[in-house]
């Protein structure tokens, strides 16, 4: 037991010595391993910023001749991240009653928060992981390349991140398609108040451009490509691709010395 405890202490002491030896080495950034990690870092920022920062609105015009109003009046519903459309109610201009209807009781249809939040949350985690990985590449280059576990952990995380980028981007792309439908021309069909029997005629006017959301989907799949491509370069750092330095040194010095002639 004492020998095992001493071995553990020695390992921790060696690890602490390596961690304390922080030296900035920018050479890994010139290699694909570090350079692609920088691209992944930037791409993750664009992914969660373009999605999480979106705010928009959709407008319809209302005409109700049965109550003596023959002019079109505008009713607006605002929405944004995390896209709980079923909580986005319609609003009229201040101190204006449109067709004697309480429009705040009428909301958009659909809840797409699960796909949007999963996408943004994962992108933020990727952003933080890229910072930690770059710090390890640049500040602890020797520790990373002399270790067997760190490159393997990095490789596993890279594979998992590639898969999750595919899943989250696909789910978010599908949700975005549904959001466009739910905030577009179909509003008039879905609103119960907009029917001839109620005497209220509704006409779709406009909806905020969702170009930034389209960009977020593009960056999602771009991230998937970057992480998938970087998996090869991370794999090359693992013991699966090349033997460790320890094994190499044993193989070189393990044979019996040759006798001179």
From Swiss-Prot:
Glycans are attached at residues 72, 95, 214. Residues 55-117, 173-214 are vesicular. GO terms for cellular component: cytoplasmic vesicle membrane; melanosome; membrane; secretory granule; synaptic vesicle. PROSITE patterns: MARVEL. Residues 241-261 are annotated as: Disordered. The chain crosses the membrane at residues 34-54, 118-138, 152-172, 215-235. Residues 252-261 have a biased composition (Gly residues). It is found in: Cytoplasmic vesicle membrane; Melanosome. PANTHER family: SYNAPTOPHYSIN, SYNAPTOPHYSIN-LIKE PROTEIN 1. This is Synaptophysin-like protein 1. The gene is Sypl1.
């Amino acid at each position: 037991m004492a020998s095992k405890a001493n071995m553990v202490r020695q390992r921790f002491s060696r690890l602490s010595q390596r961690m304390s030896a922080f030296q900035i080495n920018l050479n890994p950034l010139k290699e694909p391993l570090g350079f692609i990690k920088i691209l992944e870092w930037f791409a993750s920022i664009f992914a969660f910023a373009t999605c999480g920062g979106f705010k928009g609105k959709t407008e319809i015009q209302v005409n109700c001749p049965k109550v003596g109003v023959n002019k079109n009046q505008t009713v607006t519903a605002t929405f944004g991240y995390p896209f709980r459309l079923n909580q986005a109610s319609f609003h009229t201009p201040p101190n204006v009653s449109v067709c004697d209807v309480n429009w705040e009781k009428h909301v958009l249809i659909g809840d797409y928060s699960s796909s949007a939040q999963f996408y943004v949350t994962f992108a933020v985690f990727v952003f933080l992981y890229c910072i930690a990985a770059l710090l390890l590449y640049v500040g602890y280059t020797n520790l990373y390349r002399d270790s067997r576990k760190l490159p393997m952990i990095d490789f596993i995380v890279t594979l998992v991140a590639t898969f999750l980028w595919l899943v989250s981007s696909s789910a978010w792309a599908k949700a975005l398609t549904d959001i466009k439908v739910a905030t577009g021309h179909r509003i008039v069909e879905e609103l119960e108040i907009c029917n001839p029997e109620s005497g209220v005629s509704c006409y779709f006017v406009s909806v905020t451009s969702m170009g930034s959301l389209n960009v977020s989907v593009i960056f999602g799949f771009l991230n998937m490509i970057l992480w998938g491509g970087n998996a090869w370069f991370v794999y090359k750092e693992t013991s699966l691709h090349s033997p460790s330095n320890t094994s190499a040194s044993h193989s070189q010095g393990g044979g019996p010395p040759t006798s001179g002639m």
